[in-house]
From Swiss-Prot:
Record-given protein name: Gustatory receptor-like 65a
Record topological domains on the Cytoplasmic side: 1-13, 64-72, 148-161, 273-277
InterPro entries per UniProt: 7TM_chemorcpt
Regions crossing the membrane: 14-34, 43-63, 73-93, 127-147, 162-182, 252-272, 278-298
């Protein structure tokens, strides 16, 4: 098997860096055991995450309790705080399941590497998606800094700095949980992409056998049996990838629901009366579009029909024909769609949400100008 190339080495280090930051922020409660080559729960990180959660809850309760006298003006902050707190609690309670899912993903990735005959699962497009996820995180934090600095005269300099740092830490912990979800989806996209390459390789081998002059020779039948066995392994591997994808989508559906609500809040509450407010709305829309793009890419990569279009050996071997039919049947019934509580996150829903959000932002702008 070939060695890990520079691109894959950098991508793996980038993913481990994201995990390290989540551990520092008290989001992740698991560590990677290099000897056992698996993830495991850490009692210290779980205790540390609980302390961070308690501090976060106290900070949000104190800050929101002082705003109830003017709830009509600050309700977006209250709702956003509740969303962040609920997501953190949900993540801590479900931390054992995410460790199980991560270990299953590691086992599947090793099987895919064996099928592909090389350890280089990630390609440049997957690294770019990860970098875009990091860019969205940093861009959201930078926008908060801009809005807070714009209203810095409401506090003295020291108090404003402390509050700004706490707000950034709270927001960072929430954005890191969404970023972890995106990273897992990108890994699944890379896995499906590698399965495409394996399928095309089998397809090309079958095309070469189809052009063989003697289709009844013993050597030919041995090669057909070998390809049939490889195809059956591909079927089982694709089933495993499909099931782990469904479990990950189901596990994080509550996180995605909260992320969508949090991303839409500015359109219902913020008035684009200056450049900072307008930039915040644009960045919120871009973040939602990027998340939907990840969903669309995952749904598209889970389809393998285009990789099977050149399987022509089925006319010469009935058992191979049944194997290919099983793979095609699996393709028809096992297509990934990202759903949350029965609602499919497709482009139609995205267009509806963005249209409603743009209308609300326009109405808020008109009310501000009228006042």
């Amino acid at each position: 098997m070939r060695e890990v190339n520079l691109l894959n080495r950098f991508t793996r280090q980038f993913l481990f860096l994201i995990v390290l930051v989540t551990q520092i922020c008290g989001v992740a409660t698991f560590v990677y055991n290099s000897k056992a080559q698996c993830f495991r729960q850490s009692g210290f990180l779980r205790f540390y995450s609980s302390l961070v959660l308690i501090f976060l809850a106290l900070f949000l309760i104190v800050t929101t309790s002082k705003m109830f006298h003017n709830l009509q003006a600050v309700w977006p902050y209250v709702v956003g705080s509740v969303i962040i707190l609920v997501v953190r609690i949900h993540g801590l309670l479900e931390s054992a399941e995410i460790v199980e899912l991560l270990n299953q993903m590691l086992r599947i990735m090793r099987q895919v590497n064996l099928m592909a005959r090389h350890p280089n699962l990630f390609r440049l497009k997957h690294l770019l998606l990860l970098l875009l996820a990091l860019q969205n995180l940093l861009r959201s934090l930078n926008t908060i800094v801009g809005i807070s600095n714009h209203s810095a005269e409401a506090y003295d300099s020291f108090l404003n700095s402390v509050i700004l740092l706490i707000i950034l830490a709270v927001l960072l912990s929430f954005l890191l949980q969404i970023t972890i979800n995106i990273c897992l989806f990108v890994v699944l996209i890379a896995t499906y992409s590698e399965l495409h390459h394996c399928t095309r390789r089998i397809s090309n081998d079958m095309d070469k056998l189809r052009l063989h002059s003697v289709h009844e020779s013993g050597q030919f039948m041995v090669l057909v049996k070998q390809l049939q066995g490889i195809t059956e392994k591909l079927i089982r591997l694709r089933q495993n990838v499909f099931h782990i994808t469904v479990r990950i989508i189901r596990h994080f559906r509550f996180h995605w629901l909260c992320a969508i609500i949090y991303g839409l809040l500015p359109f219902f509450s913020l008035t684009a009366k200056d450049q900072n407010g307008f930039n915040f709305l644009i960045i919120s829309a871009l973040n939602i579009i990027f998340q939907w793009t990840i969903f669309a890419i995952l749904s598209r990569e889970s389809r393998i029909t285009r990789s099977l279009c050149t399987f022509h050996l089925t006319n010469y071997h009935k058992e191979t024909a049944r194997t290919i039919d099983e793979l095609l049947h699996q393709e028809i019934w096992e297509r990934i769609t990202v759903t949350i509580y029965g609602n499919t996150l497709d482009t139609k829903l995205l267009f509806k949400l963005l249209s409603i959000s743009a209308f609300c932002a326009f109405v808020n702008r008109l009310e501000y100008l009228h006042i």
